Regions:
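C-terminal regulatory/oligomerization modules of transcriptional regulators
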Residues: 1-5, 130-158
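Amphipathic, non-membrane alpha-helical segments in soluble helical-bundle scaffolds
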Residues: 4-15, 66, 103-106, 129
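Short, locally clustered residues in the helix-turn-helix/winged-helix DNA-binding domain
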Residues: 19-22, 45-49, 110, 137
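N-terminal helix-turn-helix DNA-binding core of bacterial DNA-binding proteins
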Residues: 23-68, 73, 79, 95
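Charged, amphipathic alpha-helical coiled-coil/dimerization segments
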Residues: 74-134
């Protein structure tokens, strides 16, 4: 990748990394799930990570329209990657849980992503690799803090 950008705040460098990560995310989903769209896989990921979860929670987590999530989850159900059940506490809600095949699929994509990322990191020298890993850890923590602040009732009130 040719560096044609320079920005003091690092936003352009971060955007370049984001594009590379999205490419990895897309290619690993395509390679491991011929039948799923990226949105369907993202919905399955939320179900695996948050079981049991409602369709509404999946829609909020992915910032998608509930009808889009319903269609994605219907497809996942047809492929036997998730199961649906009525919520015993609220009959208007449907609870979602992954099947064994759904969990295995998410695990397979995760293994492929780890393999690809490890290959990219191996291309860096030891010092650059260690610095990149530390930067990833700090960046992930900063994103988590930013997301937490965004959900804060105090921030929404301002």
């Amino acid at each position: 990748m040719t560096q044609t950008w320079q920005a003091e705040d690092g936003a352009e460098a971060a955007l370049a990394v984001l594009r590379a990560m999205v490419t990895i995310a897309n290619s690993t989903v395509e390679r491991n799930t011929e039948q799923l769209t990226l949105t369907q896989f993202r919905a399955l990921r939320v179900v695996v990570d948050r079981t049991p979860v409602t369709m509404g929670k999946v829609a909020r987590e992915l910032a998608l329209n509930p009808s889009s999530v319903t269609r994605a989850c219907d497809r996942l159900g047809t492929l036997a990657l998730l199961e649906k059940a009525p919520n015993p506490l609220n009959r208007r809600e449907t609870l979602l849980a992954p099947t064994g095949a759904g969990r295995q699929l998410v695990d397979r994509v995760d293994r492929d992503r780890r393999r690809v990322l490890a290959g990219v990191l191996r291309r860096l020298g030891p010092g650059a690799r260690d610095a990149a890993i530390q930067a990833f850890e700090r960046f992930a923590a900063a994103v988590e803090a930013e997301e937490s602040d965004a959900r804060s009732p105090l921030r929404r009130a301002t």
